[in-house]
Structure formats: C-alpha cells, structure tokens
Amino acid sequence: MAKLIVNADDFGYSEGVNHGIISAHKNGIVTSCTVMANMPGFEHGMALIKENPTLRCGVHMTLTCYKPLLKDHKTIVDENGNFFRRPSEEVLKNIDLEEVYREFKAQIEKVRERVEITHLDSHHHVHGEEYLRPVIERIANEYKLPMRQSSEMAIDGVTYAKCLGNFYMNNVKEE
C-alpha cells in the first residue's frame, strides 16, 4: 500500500490542466487524480488516462463549477443553467438534495463507464459541508469508495484519506 498519495484534482477542467497533471505523474510526483466529469476537458482527460494506466483515478464531484451533466435541475443552477459558484444563504436553504444526489451519481457513473474509480472527493470540498451530509452518506454507502476527508464530518463505514487541508486553506487564494 502506498504511504503517500499525491492527488491532483480538477482533471478534466481543461486540456492545459490535464497535460499538467499527466506531466507531474510522468515525473513521479502525482500518483492519482480526481476527474471533473462535467467539464470541457473531460474527454481529453479520459484519452490521456488510457495512455497512462498507472495514474489512479477518482471522481471530483462538482457542484460549484460550469454546468451540470443533468439538465432538469431547478435549485442547484442559476438562470443560465450553470452551477452557482458561491451559493448564497438563500440558495443553500432551498437546495433540493435529491438534485444534488442525482447529479453526483451522474458524474460518478460517467467516469465509471470509462475507468476504474479509486476514490471520491469534491470541487471546493463541498462533500464536507454539513448541509450535504445526507447526500454524501447516501453516495458513500452506495459506492463504498474511499473518500478524501475535508472536514471533521465522518460517515460510518467510509474509509477516509486524510489530507493536508491547512496547506490548501492557508496557501491557495481564489480571486
């Protein structure tokens, strides 16, 4: 078993991100990635995964970037059909958790059709948000995959990979 996992998230975001992650993997830095199934670079990323079978692949469940895979959502998208980048308190109060579940499941299944999934995490660490706990518990129990721990929230029966969250929180700045 690996003693250190270096995971690169946002795989599938764009061709540039994909090439950067593949380069880091080929140079012995990155050992796994998590894929954004809803992003424009997804197909490109899947082609690169086939060429690099030693790169383990998880799903980077996405609820705050670009567009959902499913088009019938009402509460998790704006008037243009895009995910809310930073949902307001009003939006959060009215989210239909069934929509979130169906979207996360669609993302997982899209990746699973192409590659063996090794683990789960999420864009902007939304899987650690308490309001999504019922959805994350349901996904965790259904798929039985290890999950990156992003908060103190723990779900019975889920294996967590601890991460250096302080590095992210203290060093990554969003504009």
Where are these regions (language model features)?
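Boundary/entry segment of secreted carbohydrate-active catalytic domains
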Residues: 1-15, 21
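Structural preference for beta-strand elements that scaffold enzyme active sites
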Residues: 3-5, 30-34, 54-60, 117-121, ...
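Histidine-centered catalytic micro-motifs
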Residues: 6-12, 61, 119-129
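A short alpha/beta connector and helix-capping loop motif
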Residues: 15-40
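Acidic (Asp/Glu)-rich catalytic clusters
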Residues: 21-27, 45-56, 74-78, 112-113
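Short, structured active-site "lid" loops
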Residues: 50-68
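Active-site gating loops and adjacent loop-to-helix segments of metal-dependent hydrolytic enzymes
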Residues: 67-95
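Catalytic domains of cell-wall/extracellular-matrix polysaccharide-remodeling enzymes
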Residues: 105-174
